[in-house]
Structure formats: C-alpha cells, structure tokens
Regions:
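Acidic-aromatic/histidine active-site loop/patch
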Residues: 289
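Bacterial N-terminal signal peptides that target proteins for export
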Residues: 1-10
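Terminal, non-catalytic domain-edge segments
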Residues: 292-295, 299-302
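Short coil/linker segments at helix-helix boundaries
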Residues: 31-63, 67-68, 81-196, 206-239, ...
Length: 303
C-alpha cells in the first residue's frame, strides 16, 4: 500500500507540473500573439484614439511581464511601448504646455517623459542582458560599448533601436542633468549598431534618430546629420513623414535655413495618406509639423 501511495504522489506531482507547463505555454502564446498584433495601432489616424490604446496597452504589457518576467516578447513590448508612448503622447503634452507658457505643467510632463524613458531603458537593458551580460560595465566608454554590441545580430536590431531611441530621447528631456548627458554616447552606439544590422528597421527610424543626434547643436556633426536624414527619406521613398519632420526640426533649424525648414514642414502637413502601415506615425508628424510652423517655434530657430 505504501508503494502504491508513493506512485500516486508521483502521478499527482507530474499532473501539477504538466498543468503548470500548459499554463506557461498558453501565456507565452498569448504574449507572442499580442506582440504580433500590436502593430495594428500604427494604422490608426485618430491621435486621441491611439493615445487611449497606447496607455491601455502599457497596463496590459506590465501585467504580462508580471506573470512572465522572463518572457522576451513582453520585455520588447514594454521597451517599445514606453518609448513610443513617451515620444508620441507625453512629449506632445509637454510641447503644448511649453507653447502655453505653463511652466508647472511643462515640468510635470517633462518629468513624466523622463520617467517613461527610464522605464523603457530598464526593460530594454534587461532584454539585452538576456542576450549578452555586461551592459553596465560596457557603457563606460565608446570602445567597450561597441565591443559589447558586436555580440548582437540582425534579429536584435529592433530591440537595440528602441533602447537606443529611449536613451537619446531621455538625454533630450534631461539636458540639465550632467550625468544623463555624459552617457549620450550609449544611445548613439545602440542606434548605430541597430542601423548596421538593419537600416530598414521601423521604417528607417534609426537613420532619423542618428540624423537628429548629429544635429543636436549648431556645433555638432551637421554634414553627417544630413546624410542620415537623406538616407532615411530614400529608404522610405519619402512616404514616412517623421524623418522629414525631424530633418526640419533639427538640421534645418540648426543650419538657420528658414526656407528649407518651412518647405519641408509644409510637405509633411500636405502629404497624402500613401503609407497605411505608418498612418499613426505620419499623423504624429503632421501634428508636430503644424506646431513647429508657429511663430514661437520658428523664433526658437532664430527665424
């Protein structure tokens, strides 16, 4: 009887283990499906609807990560989600507050944007560490960063891109923090490696990000900036509007080229809906382009 009881215990434990495996498999499948379907938001043209979906999505992705902390798809969704939401919606709130001369509200949204980018970086670095350990040590200088990133391949391009974009964007909203500015090279290296692996990733977003980076000041590498922007526009046949908007906002602004600045932004505003896969990103570009054609924004460029 003792032998039979022992066998029943083994069978019971095996059944419990099997149920746990089934639940994990189902959860992982749901997360994978969510990642595959998450691109549907890009086809929306309604900014407010997209904003609601994006914030709700973050809650869903956080819950998935809580249930499956080692799931790479969940980590990717959180990295991309926090980065994209901060840029598309939180920074939009910040710009509106700035234009309204509401310093308190502007500072509130700037802090929100920084926190969102910090969260994106946290999840992104966690995902990178699952591929290759040693990120914190590698970020000390450009050479060690490039050596670390040599361990990543083409299928890592999107992850590198989203982490890098979050890093660069955080530096932009925290310009008054020397510690953040001192690590700007980390974001550049991440995006550069992504572009090396797949320059078409996310509709050449890496090229546009590098273009903006190299036009960060009037004393920066403006010739290199223009090359990156022109390549991004070439790769997307001019149909992805964010590279064009960013070209005007950064490069033409820093060059003091008012004619090209206005011409490019008006091209963005007047562009037809020819890229449904990037309808939301193009709607965001149009929204920002209209804002940057305002007198106050143009005055910031010295126009």
């Amino acid at each position: 009887m003792r032998h039979v009881g022992g066998r029943w215990w083994i069978v019971a434990m095996a059944a419990i283990f099997a149920v746990g495996c089934i639940k994990t498999t189902i959860l992982n499948g749901q997360i994978k499906g969510t990642r595959e379907g998450s691109v549907a938001i890009d086809t929306l043209s309604d900014f407010e609807v997209a904003r609601t979906i994006a914030y709700a999505g973050l809650g869903q992705f956080e819950g998935m990560h809580e249930l499956a902390p080692d799931n790479e798809d969940a980590l990717f969704l959180l990295t991309k989600g926090w980065t994209a939401t901060a840029f598309a919606f939180i920074e939009d709130d910040y710009e509106m507050a700035v234009d309204a001369d509401d310093e308190a509200r502007a500072e509130y949204h700037r802090a929100r944007a920084r926190a969102a980018y910090d969260r994106a970086i946290h999840y992104g670095v966690t995902l990178l560490e699952m591929r290759a350990k040693g990120f914190d040590k590698a970020k000390n200088n450009i050479a060690s960063m490039k050596l670390y990133l040599s361990q990543f391949y083409r299928n890592d391009a999107l992850t590198l891109l989203w982490v890098g974009q979050a890093w660069l964007a955080k530096s932009n909203v925290a310009k008054d923090d020397p510690a953040v500015v001192a690590e700007l090279h980390v974001g550049e290296a991440l995006v550069e490696r992504s572009v090396e692996l797949d320059e078409n990733a996310a509709y050449a977003a890496g090229r546009a990000a590098l273009g903006a980076y190299h036009a960060r000041t009037a004393m920066a590498e403006l010739d290199m900036s223009l090359k990156h922007f022109m390549r991004a526009i070439e790769l997307t046949r001019g149909n992805a509007l964010l590279p064009k908007f960013t070209l005007a906002r950064t490069y033409y602004c820093m060059k003091g080229d008012k004619a090209s600045y206005e011409k490019t932004l008006r091209e963005v505003v007047d562009a037809a809906d020819v890229l449904p896969e990037q309808r939301l990103q193009n709607a965001i570009a149009k929204r920002r382009a209209r804002r940057y054609l305002s007198k106050s924004r143009m005055a910031n460029c010295g126009f």
